[in-house]
Curated annotation (Swiss-Prot):
One of its GO terms (biological process) is protein quality control for misfolded or incompletely synthesized proteins. This is ATP-dependent Clp protease proteolytic subunit 2. GO terms for cellular component: cytoplasm; endopeptidase Clp complex. The lineage of its organism: Bacteria, Bacillati, Cyanobacteriota, Cyanophyceae, Synechococcales. The gene is clpP2. Cleaves peptides in various proteins in a process that requires ATP hydrolysis. Has a chymotrypsin-like activity. Plays a major role in the degradation of misfolded proteins.
Length: 200
């Protein structure tokens, strides 16, 4: 039986009445966002809107983005990435579980010094995926050029974010490349491995 989205009690500031809200709404009040699924256009639109709102409310406070994601759409992920860079608020990224593919890219895109992972997290980087789906050769060629352009852009960004050479990133992302939290720190994907909330 599915668990569904849990509800928790929440008291509005200045009110004596409690009301029940879903856990993600309650976390949002504390500037905590959660990417806990595949990156899609809908997920990206929701995260972008929440980051823009929180930044407009108070750009001096950080936004916390917890990530447990297998990755997903490159274009949707780049919308989140661009917004992370656009907002004035620091974006603290924290891997809980798995940050793979676009999830790993977003983890690494957090504010320098504030890219974190829990001890048993796994991080996986690789090149962007694409498929042909029985289309005309000219369409396949166009898509292949676009995938290569995106791959080059992502590899350059990842090299800049990690301090690794472009050539190393290109080689390591040729196939699925898994790292433990400690290995991800050594690689430059994150800044610290944390075990307690007060370390964030």
């Amino acid at each position: 039986m599915p668990i569904g989205t849990p509800s928790v009690p929440y008291r509005l500031p200045g009110s004596q009445m409690e009301r029940w809200v879903d856990i993600y709404t309650r976390l949002g009040v504390e500037r905590i966002l959660f990417l806990g699924q595949e990156v899609s256009d809908g997920v990206a639109n929701s995260l972008v809107a929440q980051m823009l709102y929180l930044d407009s409310e108070d750009s001096t406070k950080p936004i916390y983005l917890y990530i447990n994601s297998p990755g997903g759409s490159v274009t949707a992920g780049l919308a989140i990435y661009d917004t992370m860079k656009y907002v004035k608020s620091d974006v603290v990224t924290i891997c809980v579980g798995l940050a793979a593919s676009m999830g790993a890219f977003l983890l690494t895109a957090g504010t320098k010094g504030k890219r974190l992972a829990l001890p048993h997290s796994r991080i996986m980087i690789h090149q962007p995926l694409g498929g042909t789906n029985q289309r005309q050769a000219s369409d396949i060629e166009i898509e292949a050029r676009e995938i290569l352009r995106i791959k080059d852009m992502l590899n350059h960004s990842m090299a800049e974010l990690t301090g690794q050479s472009f050539e190393k990133i290109e080689k390591d992302t040729d196939r699925d490349y898994f790292l433990s939290a400690a290995e991800a720190k050594d690689y430059g994907l994150i800044d610290r491995v944390i075990a307690h909330p007060n370390e964030a």
